[in-house]
Every structure is written in structure tokens, then in C-alpha cells.
Amino acid sequence: MIDADRLITAVGGRDRDEQLDRAIRPLSLADYIGQPTVREQMELFIQAARGRSEALDHTLIFGPPGLGKTTLANIIAQEMGVSIKSTSGPVLERPGDLAAILTNLEPNDVLFIDEIHRLSPIVEEVLYPAMEDFQLDIMIGEGPAARSIKLDLPPFTLVGATTRAGMLTNPLRDRFGIVQRLEFYNIADLSTIVARSAGILGLVIEPAGAFEIARRARGTPRIANRLLRRVRDFAQVRGNGQITRQTADKALNLLDVDEHGFDHQDRRLLLTMIEKFDGGPVGVDSLAAAISEERHTIEDVLEPYLIQQGYIMRTPRGRVVTRHAYLHFGLNIPTRMGEMPVAGEFVDDAADL
């Protein structure tokens, strides 16, 4: 199992960190940094919906963890001037759980369902008419006396978030009028996010210090903010409280986060593939067993950034490390790698192996 306190994981952390995350989240599209295409499109859609005094179309937001799906959902509600009710797929175990939330929505409210790909089929069936016709079909009674009744719902916007859009059923996916994919952030945008967060937290940070944190944050705002808080601790105890490039570098080296944003678990994954599987190809289940992790942890937490940076490829035969992985560890590149495809030639769908 992955360490819940792993510094550079993009999954949720400790309660204290989550409270600070909420404190530094942007509340409007004007404050939302990065994702320029998504921001421009959502600004247009929201302005149009408000002009018609209608609920915004149902919106699906997907992408790797930590890129701001929850933040964007809250911004949508804020920009629409409505309330937001938040829940998650695993929490909605029975149709009655969903019905209780839907019947308490006000007109044009936002219902945010995180991890929407984990909805049970029976709950998903109830959601279809609610999304399409704003009606709720519920069963009253049991056995021969059971009957179905329809309840009218006020117009609302469902915002679904998922890290695994491919696991959504086609009927559910087709009911979203707006689909947005969040991409990993570039270093410039992450530097701006770090500087903004530092200002909110009352920290003194130099641009070079913000850049140093940003370049090791794996393209993920949540990780950037978490690193900022740990560098703050280092600067407070072993420095003068000011975050410079040198301070950030020393702090992150102490925390075992290297210049590429890799920690010991990333390096363990890559070295396992190189040393135990000769660089691959290796199936994800075999890899999970070798490093004592769960399959979904590799697919959702460890792999995405390594693939995006070109250190791992998904091929029809399994996962394969690239030249970059050998160079990262100062290892000799096998001669056979001259015959291998370049990173990115194979599509992600190729390896559920």
C-alpha cells in the first residue's frame, strides 16, 4: 500500500494539509491559474448559462489526481452564484442516498460527485433520468405492492470528477454536455501558484525559490502546495524564514525529492523494472507484486507523470522503461534499446497487461 503521507503523492493527505489546501484554493476563474483552454471555455459556458438564467450543462472533469478538479467544481458554483453539494461515488451506496441529495437541491444548484466512476450500477440507473429529464424514479414499498413514482427535480448541474474516464459507462458519459480534461501544469504556471499560495500563507519567497519548488512538483498544484509547506518548515527552523532557491533546494534534497520530482517510490518502480524485469515489457500485475503495491496505485498515482515525462511506455506487451530511465540512474543503455520505439508511440489503451 502506498504511504498516505508520501510527500509527492497527489492523493489527499492529512486533515491539516487539506484544511490549508482549502484556504489557498482560488474561488473564481479570474484567480484560476493554468489550464487556459479549460478556463476560457468554462468562462464562456458559464456566462451563457447565466445570461439565460439556466443551469449549466452537466460537466465531466477528468485528469490525474491533484490538478484541481474539486477546485474547478467549486469555482463553477461560485461563478454561477449557486450552492454546491459535494459527495463521492463510493459514498452513494443506495438509490436512497442519491435521492436524499437530489430532492434537497435548489434550482440551478451544483451537485459535485467525486470519483464518479465508482458509482454502483443501481445508483447510476437512478441518475440517468435525473440528469436528462430532471425527474427521479423511486420505488415505494416491497414485493407485489411495490410501485414506481416520479418526482420532479429542479434544474441542476451535475459536475462529475474522475481520474479514470475510461471506466465510465457510455450512457453516463454521453449525458455530460461539457467534458473537460485537466493536463499537467507547466513550471511557469506552477511557479505562479506557489507564489500565490506563499502570499496567502504570509511567507516571503523569492521567484527562484518558487521556481525550484515548482520544477519538482510533478506538474501538480496539490504537490506544489504540499512541498511549499514543507520548505516553509525547513526555512523556519534552519534558515531565516525566507524561501530562496538555495533554501528550497536543501529542503527538497533533505526530503528525498530530486530535481525531476521523483521520490523513493518512483525510483523504486523504475529500478525494479530495470533490475528485475530487464527494462520490460512487464505486466502491471507483475510489477505491482514486485513492489508490493496495488495495481490501481501504479496506474493512478505512480505511472501518469512517469509516462508524461517519457520514462515509461505502455506497449501492447506491457510496461517498458525508456532511455531516460537508464540515464537518470547513470546506467548504461542496453544496445537493444536502439530497436525500441520512442516514448509516446503506443497509446495508453494498449496495456491493461
Curated annotation (Swiss-Prot):
State its location(s). Cytoplasm
Question: Which leading EC class covers this enzyme?
Answer: hydrolase
**Annotated positions binding ATP:** 24-25, 66, 69-71, 132-134, 175, 185, 222
Cite the GO molecular-function annotations of the record: ATP binding; ATP hydrolysis activity; four-way junction DNA binding; four-way junction helicase activity
Q: Where is this region: Head domain (RuvB-H)?
A: 259-353
Q: Which Gene3D superfamilies match?
A: 1.10.8.60, P-loop containing nucleotide triphosphate hydrolases, Winged helix-like DNA-binding domain superfamily/Winged helix DNA-binding domain
- EC numbers on record: 3.6.4.-
Residues recorded as binding Mg(2+), renumbered to this chain, are 70
Residues binding DNA: 295, 314, 319
State the reactions this protein catalyses: ATP + H2O = ADP + phosphate + H(+)
Matching InterPro entries: AAA+_ATPase, AAA_lid_4, DNA_helicase_Holl-junc_RuvB, P-loop_NTPase, RuvB-like_N, RuvB_C, WH-like_DNA-bd_sf, WH_DNA-bd_sf
Note down the stretches annotated as region Small ATPAse domain (RuvB-S): 186-256
Q: Which GO terms describe its biological process?
A: DNA recombination; DNA repair
Family statement drawn from the similarity comment of this UniProt entry: Belongs to the RuvB family.
How does the record describe its quaternary structure?
Homohexamer. Forms an RuvA(8)-RuvB(12)-Holliday junction (HJ) complex. HJ DNA is sandwiched between 2 RuvA tetramers; dsDNA enters through RuvA and exits via RuvB. An RuvB hexamer assembles on each DNA strand where it exits the tetramer. Each RuvB hexamer is contacted by two RuvA subunits (via domain III) on 2 adjacent RuvB subunits; this complex drives branch migration. In the full resolvosome a probable DNA-RuvA(4)-RuvB(12)-RuvC(2) complex forms which resolves the HJ.
Instruction: Show the HAMAP family listed in the entry.
Output: DNA_HJ_migration_RuvB (MF_00016)
Domain notes for this protein: Has 3 domains, the large (RuvB-L) and small ATPase (RuvB-S) domains and the C-terminal head (RuvB-H) domain. The head domain binds DNA, while the ATPase domains jointly bind ATP, ADP or are empty depending on the state of the subunit in the translocation cycle. During a single DNA translocation step the structure of each domain remains the same, but their relative positions change.
Briefly state the protein's biological role: The RuvA-RuvB-RuvC complex processes Holliday junction (HJ) DNA during genetic recombination and DNA repair, while the RuvA-RuvB complex plays an important role in the rescue of blocked DNA replication forks via replication fork reversal (RFR). RuvA specifically binds to HJ cruciform DNA, conferring on it an open structure. The RuvB hexamer acts as an ATP-dependent pump, pulling dsDNA into and through the RuvAB complex. RuvB forms 2 homohexamers on either side of HJ DNA bound by 1 or 2 RuvA tetramers; 4 subunits per hexamer contact DNA at a time.
Annotated protein name in UniProt: Holliday junction branch migration complex subunit RuvB
Q: In the UniProt record, what gene is named as encoding this protein?
A: ruvB
